[in-house]
Amino acid sequence: MQEQKLQENDFSTLQTFKRLWPMIKPFKAGLIASGIALVFNALADSGLIYLLKPLLDDGFGKANHSFLKIMAFVVVGMIILRGVTNFISNYCLAWVSGKVVMTMRRRLFKHLMFMPVSFFDRNSTGKLLSRITYDSEMIASSSSGSLITIVREGAYIISLLAVMFYTSWELTLVLFVIGPIIAVLITIVSKIFRKLSKNLQDSMGELTATTEQMLKGHKVVISFGGQFVEEERFNKVSNNMRRKGMKMVTADSISDPVVQIIASLALVAVLFLATTPLIAEDNLSAGSFTVVFSSMLAMMRPLKSLTNVNSQFQRGMAACQTLFAILDLEPEKDNGTYKAEPAKGALEFKNVSFAYQGKEELALNNISFSVPAGKTVALVGRSGSGKSTIANLVTRFYDIEQGEILLDGVNIQDYRLSNLRENCAVVSQQVHLFNDTIANNIAYAAQDKYSREEIIAAAKAAYALEFIEKLPQGFDTVIGENGASLSGGQRQRLAIARALLRNSPVLILDEATSALDTESERAIQSALDELKKDRTVIVIAHRLSTIENADEILVIDHGEIRERGNHKALLEQNGAYKQLYSMQFSG
């Protein structure tokens, strides 16, 4: 059985960006508009510096007041151009970033919904939430910010070089010696930044998972006085994240001054060259020297930004790799083509053995039994004996590698997954409700399929109508996250109503009445007894009183069937079932 682990591949920046590009490509018009605006923004900046030469040589040097007045309007025009192009570039890039993040999140969300249950067993919810929220946003903020810097500062440097070369090509040659050194430096630190950024994102996932664990288990924490334990756990994880963050800052802080020092050497070289006879005799005016020197000073900022953008861009690429690691995982297998509308409900297990991923011990060992259509089989045994595993295999939450499970004589592997699960309704011990109305929770994923009358009928059959009618908006009451405003018994009744409404031929009740009081349990049991006439029912129960009328009872122990028969026959055997029964009713 293939293990579904999150494991990032160490692709190069170029390989990662190539995978990201198909998500960006549909919005390339925004990128082009932003790029053009950034280029004009850079030209306006470099143009302002170039104007220093005529201002100094012609305007102030020759006291040409008419020229100075004209130049004043030119300067204002260039500043307006800078403002307009800055707005266009920022807006267009924000639009593209938002679209890319939305596309990535939608792909992730859809992919996660089709992952097998085993994937979620092995990966914490907190880390997955961090991937969808933090990492996807990191792609937008890092990549868009990096793109702005690369295009604007790159265009600015090129335009400054053009201005310098046009003004004095001799002095400009100094930069062609310094440039390759800076390029080599940036290449070296890029791999370091990507590795450090990956570690930082992993720490963010651990932090989210730790926080989520405390929030979800808050009642347990305060009940057992575990605040100190959780605080220590959180402090350790948050300090680990802080340390990894400081490594990023250290690498960033070291690379920045190194580039600045190398660039400053170019300024020193220009000052010395300006005094040499070759340059001095070449009619180098004050305006020309000022333009070259100012251009070199102005180039310090974009060089610094381009150095910093590398770390920013690597954070985005590292986030991409973590997200692509999820998208590369194989979704739940759905190779079947058979459809039954509806199935009759005859179930059969043939020599089924099963072990959970990462565990050598078998959860089920050579299990064989059959349930004729319309009959009820009950599974009893101690916790961890394998009862719930049997229920999970019927719906293919997990796939077996040994044996067969048949529905109406057809291997469930041959069914289309959606069709198989349409024919099975599950009510488990742990009820999950959505932050929606009661009606929408009962008719979940099929609100348009059922009428309000059918929803009310299902609620009535589940003995939920009484408490629903007492709520402020009745069936239109929003119940909060996971039904937080309801009691455990009320939540369980809604889950039963959901299963009743679905009207599937196979009904799986995994401790379905465990959260109900005795009176409610009797009422629910009466409703379930009526359902057994037309459905195949698998009942998993600790309370043996709820399964006395089952057509067959299987006693499961350590993944094997120890005893089988109806209630009366098993009591007469005086075996494991009799012991369980005596333990429950001895008091």
From Swiss-Prot:
Enzyme class: translocase
Domain ABC transporter, first and last residues per copy: 347-583
Gene3D superfamilies: ABC transporter type 1, transmembrane domain, P-loop containing nucleotide triphosphate hydrolases
Sequence intervals crossing the membrane: 31-51, 68-88, 145-165, 169-189, 259-279
Localisation per UniProt entry: Cell inner membrane
GO MF: ABC-type oligopeptide transporter activity; ATP binding; ATP hydrolysis activity; ATPase-coupled lipid transmembrane transporter activity
ABC transmembrane type-1 domain boundaries: 32-315
First-listed, main subcellular location of the protein, grouped into a coarse class: membrane
Key words, A-Z: ATP-binding, Cell inner membrane, Cell membrane, Lipid transport, Membrane, Nucleotide-binding, Translocase, Transmembrane, Transmembrane helix, Transport
Membrane topology: Multi-pass membrane protein
Record EC number: 7.5.2.6
Pfam families associated with the record: ABC_membrane, ABC_tran
Binding positions (ATP): G381, R382, S383, G384, S385, G386, K387, S388
Record keyword Coiled coil present: no
A GO CC annotation given for this chain: plasma membrane
Known function: Involved in lipopolysaccharide (LPS) biosynthesis. Translocates lipid A-core from the inner to the outer leaflet of the inner membrane. Transmembrane domains (TMD) form a pore in the inner membrane and the ATP-binding domain (NBD) is responsible for energy generation.
UniProt record similarity statement: Belongs to the ABC transporter superfamily. Lipid exporter (TC 3.A.1.106) family.
Note on domains (UniProt): In MsbA the ATP-binding domain (NBD) and the transmembrane domain (TMD) are fused.
Subunit structure of this chain's protein: Homodimer.
Name of the protein described by the UniProt record: ATP-dependent lipid A-core flippase
Organism: Haemophilus influenzae (strain 86-028NP)
Organism taxonomic ancestry: Bacteria, Pseudomonadati, Pseudomonadota, Gammaproteobacteria, Pasteurellales
